[in-house]
Structure formats: C-alpha cells, structure tokens
C-alpha cells in the first residue's frame, strides 16, 4: 500500500502520523511496554491529544521477538486467527540501560532507544538484522472520499471481489534493509523470486499463474541477511518491498492493531526452523505423493483409451509414474460439480480405476465448491439449504465458470456433511486423492 508522494509528502486523502518518541517505558519479567507518541512531548499541553500507539514487545520462544501495536483497543476481536505454538513459560532477558531498553531471546536481541527520538534495532549476536527509526511506525487515516471511491469500485463487481471493507484506519511498520539485501517469501508467488521492488498483497485470488495475484499467500518474508518477519494477520496485509521507500520493507494492515514477529538465526535454515516452530509444520504425506504426477490437463479431449495411451507412453520411455490425475472433464460439461463420471467417456469408472491401480498408480480427480444448475445435485442443494443465499433468501447464482452455478455454504454443518458424503462415494469407488480447486474469491 503506497501512501507516500515521493519521500517528503504523503498522497492526498491520507493523514499519516509517525511515532517520534518512546514517551513511557515499562518492563516486566516477560515484556516491554512502550507508550509511543507522534511527537516529542515537551510540555503538559502536548499530552492532550493523540494519536498515541501502545507497543508491547515480548518473546515466547527462543530467537523470536513479538511486536504488538495497538491504537484503539475497544474494537471487536472477530477476525480469523492463525494458531501459534507460543511457549507461555519462556522468559526473555530484559534490562534497562542508559540510553535504551533491551530484550534478549536466545542470540536475538532488540534494542529500543530512550530519549527524544524513535529507534528500534534487531540483532543476532553482534550482527545487525533490521529495525526502524524516524518515519517507521505509523498510523494512517484514509479520508472518507477515498474510502467511498474504493467501496464503490468493489460494489460494481457482484461476485469476484475483495471483501468490502469500510475501515479507514491502517497501521504500518517499516523495517530497514541493507545494501544488496534480498527479500524472499510471501507464500506461493509467480512474480520474480527476489521480491525487492515489488508490491505484494496478502489476499487469496483465483488469478492464474502469471500475475501478482496468487492462491496461497503467507505474510512471512525471509531476508538474505538471515532473519525473517511474520505479520500475524489474516487480514489484507500489503507489503512494499523497497518499492515505496527503497531502503525499507513496509507492511500495512487495516484496523487498529498490528502484530508481527522477528526471527533471528545463524542462517536461513535456522530462521525457517524458528518460523515453522511457531506457526506449525505439516504432517508428512504418503511417500507416493513425492513421485511424478501425470495430468490430463485442462481442456484435453480424453477417454479411457486416451489416458492409457498417456500412461503406456510413460512406461515405454522408462519414466516412473506414481499418480494419474483427471482434471475437470472427468465429469460432463456444464454439470460441475456433480461427482459423477461422464458415462460417454468412462462407461465403467470403477473397473477403470481398478485397472489403473493394477498398474501401480494412485488416482486423483478434480473438484470445486460450486454446483452448476444442470448438475443433478443442484435441486437437492437448493431444497436443503446447502448453498450460499442472497439477502432475500434465494440461492446466489452466477454464470462465471459454470452457467447458473451455486456455491456450497461450508458454514452450514449440514452442507459440509453432505459434501463429505459425495467425497466418500469417490473414495469408495477407488479414487485416492482430490484436487480441491477454486473458492479463493468467495
């Protein structure tokens, strides 16, 4: 989210207030609490208004330092949250020095300047990682006319759009980068691997594989200087990687709270170990999933004879194959999803799956969370209330992707149990894996 108009000014319609001073600093056994003001307070009269930010620094795991920033605390805490494995029993070392207050977690250290200026610095041992100074931490107010124009543009799109968000307050942090430092990460991305110079938005979209949009956004970046930053928000986090200010990575979130973690390590592998220790690690999938998967691809015209031609061709070329994947057209066109094989192409799917298994293959099929009007499942879903509805109680439908398609309402327990039953039918038939496509823009 670019707010600046060059280095000296901000864009019209935005009021930006930067933290200028750690006015009050309190320490406990496990955290540092800072009352941060937007100017250096020189007399009592300057304490009559804000905005102030209350910043809490803590560490619940070795070599991980958490920064939590609040403006207003009276809002509703109703956003989805990431599950984190913090150790409530872990205590960092905290001490006050002449010109700073220091937190030490393992070999990772944070220093916060005291006095009439704002500065934070993160180190791993004696090695500087990153930090903030003047014009780093800020609160941003968006003018109503900017908000109204933003909302109007979203209302004009009746389905595939970001959430319509009327909030006009944003919190932003800007952390320094050094000469030659490279930034990586942010989840699945199709833009250049080195992210310097890019604007990176954390919002899952069905945007294909050749734009800045992506399907699996993760608000974590990794630096070539062996540190990482994770923004703990499932909201629409916007990163500017040396693209708004060329020597900083900035991240902005809508609302009154911003929380992020800094991970220190001796190398990139150690940083990733700390990140996954906090956020979790996936279970190890079956061994065959690491092998080669062969797909029908999207619009290929295929039947059982065609797929055996593909599979036999791999064997003739001595290319080992573990999984064969059927994309959308295993079902009849205009009927996705109906969870039924196209009988014109696959008259005996159970026998076909058995033959594929006899060749030592696992089988995967494609699905999505939509039900076309011509699907045999549409009437059942409508009658039982399994679909997302309009405000008037009618089924929401559109013609994007499949004509007249409805969207399964997975907030309805009866709907997802129904959907589970449809999946079980496939598994009982001999399908081993499911490609769960779409759903990003709902």
Question: Each PLM stretch: what is its role?
Answer:
Residues 31, 226, 289:
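A residue-level signal for beta-strand positions that form part of recognition/binding surfaces
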